[in-house]
C-alpha cells in the first residue's frame, strides 16, 4: 500500500511523535506486548470456535480470517510498517561502483580486524553493559548519530525484553526483533554480553524509523563507533562477517588470519551460540522473513543484511567511525 510522498512524510512525523508514548506504554506491561497479543488472539480464536462450534461454516470463517489478517496488516503499516517505503541509506548515498570494488572491501575488513585486535583488552577490562543499562549507554550515541542521518526527533529507548518465543529465537538463529505492534525490543536470551550493544543499537535503529536491515546495521555501527571501547568492539564484531561475505575466498582467509587470539575466542563463542539453532527451524524462519521483506518491496529479501557492507565500504571511514559524506535529505526539499 504505497503512500504518496507528502502523506508518507506526514506519517513519519506522526510516527516520531507517537513512538515514545507507545513504547512507554508497552514498557509498563508485566510481560512483552507481543506475548500478550499472541496469547490474547489465541484465546479469542479458541473461544469463538468453541462457542460457535455447532454453527461454524467454512466460507464465513474464511472471510473472517481474511478480514482479520487485512486489519492486522493495516495496523502493522500504520504503527511502523510504512517506514519500509523510505529510501535506504544506500540509495541516498549514491554509491558508485568504483567505491564497492574488492580493494576497498579488503581495506575496510582489515581495518575492522585491526580495531578488534587493538580494542579487545580494553573492551574486556570492565563489565559489559547489562540489558537494563542499554538505554542509558546507547541513548547518547544514538542521539549524536541520528541527526546526521536526517532523524531530528529522539526516540524513547526501551530496555530490551525477553519473550515467550525465546525458544523459537534460539532454534531459528534469531538474535532479536522490533515488535511493530508495541514498538518494543525483544532479544534472544542467549545473546552474549559482548554482542548486546551492537544488537540493541540495531533494534533501536529500527525504532528510529530505519526499517531496512542494512540501514539499521549501519546506524548501529555509526552509533557504537562514537562510544566507548566496548561499544566500538561490539560493533566491529557485528559487521566483520558481513564484510567478509563479499570478498574472494582467498582474501577472506588472509583477513581472518590477522584476527588476534582474543577476538578469535569471541568469534568462536558467537559461533558456538549460533550452533544451537535447528537447521529446519532456521530455514523456515528465514524463508518466511524473506517473503515478508519482499512483500514490503525489499527486492533482495534477507540478503539486505549483507548490504551493510556495501554502505560501509562505499561511504564510511573505518579510522573515524563516520560517513565520508552525508546522505541526501529525505523527504527531499522543494
Residue ranges and their predicted role:
Residues 1-51:
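Membrane-embedded alpha-helical segments of integral membrane proteins
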Residues 7, 11, 81-104:
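Alpha-helical transmembrane signal-anchor/signal-peptide segments
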Residues 29-32, 101-124:
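Short extracytoplasmic
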Residues 30, 196-222:
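Active-site recognition of the HExxH zinc-binding catalytic motif
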Residues 43-50, 55-90:
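Transmembrane alpha-helices and immediately adjacent membrane-cytoplasm interface residues
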Residues 105, 112, 211-253:
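Post-HExxH zinc-binding segment in Zn-dependent metallohydrolases
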Residues 123-189, 193:
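Auxiliary, metal-adjacent structural segments of Zn-dependent hydrolase domains
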Residues 261-334:
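Pan-zinc metallopeptidase signature
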Amino acid at each position: 500500500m504505497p503512500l504518496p510522498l507528502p502523506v508518507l512524510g506526514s506519517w513519519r512525523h506522526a510516527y516520531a511523535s507517537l513512538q515514545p508514548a507507545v513504547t512507554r506504554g508497552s514498557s509498563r506491561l508485566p510481560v512483552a506486548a507481543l506475548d500478550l497479543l499472541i496469547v490474547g488472539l489465541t484465546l479469542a480464536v479458541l473461544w469463538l470456535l468453541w462457542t460457535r462450534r455447532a454453527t461454524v461454516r467454512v466460507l464465513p470463517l474464511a472471510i473472517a480470517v481474511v478480514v482479520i489478517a487485512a486489519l492486522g496488516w493495516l495496523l502493522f503499516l500504520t504503527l511502523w510498517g510504512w517506514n519500509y517505503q523510505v529510501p535506504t541509506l544506500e540509495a541516498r548515498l549514491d554509491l558508485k561502483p568504483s567505491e564497492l570494488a574488492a580493494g576497498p572491501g579488503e581495506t575496510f575488513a582489515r581495518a575492522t580486524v585491526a580495531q578488534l585486535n587493538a580494542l579487545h583488552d580494553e573492551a574486556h577490562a570492565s563489565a559489559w553493559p547489562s540489558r537494563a543499562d542499554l538505554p542509558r549507554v546507547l541513548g547518547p550515541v544514538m542521539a549524536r548519530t541520528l541527526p546526521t542521518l536526517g532523524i531530528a526527533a529522539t526516540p524513547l529507548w526501551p530496555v530490551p525484553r525477553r519473550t515467550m518465543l525465546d525458544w523459537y529465537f534460539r532454534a531459528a538463529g534469531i538474535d532479536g526483533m522490533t515488535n511493530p505492534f508495541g514498538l518494543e525490543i525483544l532479544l534472544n536470551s542467549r545473546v552474549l554480553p559482548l554482542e548486546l550493544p551492537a544488537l540493541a543499537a540495531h533494534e533501536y535503529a529500527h525504532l528510529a524509523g530505519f526499517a531496512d536491515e542494512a540501514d539499521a546495521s549501519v546506524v548501529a555501527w555509526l552509533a557504537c563507533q562514537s562510544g566507548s571501547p566496548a561499544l566500538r568492539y561490539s560493533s566491529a564484531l557485528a559487521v566483520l562477517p558481513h564484510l567478509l561475505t563479499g570478498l574472494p575466498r582467498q582474501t577472506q582467509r588472509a583477513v581472518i588470519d590477522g584476527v588476534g587470539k582474543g577476538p578469535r575466542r569471541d568469534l568462536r563463542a558467537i559461533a558456538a551460540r549460533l550452533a544451537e539453532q535447528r537447521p529446519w527451524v532456521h530455514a523456515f524462519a528465514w524463508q518466511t522473513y524473506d517473503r515478508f521483506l519482499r512483500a514490503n518491496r525489499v527486492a533482495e529479501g534477507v540478503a539486505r543484511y549483507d548490504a551493510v557492507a556495501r554502505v560501509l565500504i562505499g561511504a564510511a571511514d573505518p579510522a573515524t567511525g563516520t560517513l565520508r559524506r552525508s546522505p541526501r535529505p529525505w523527504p527531499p526539499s522543494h
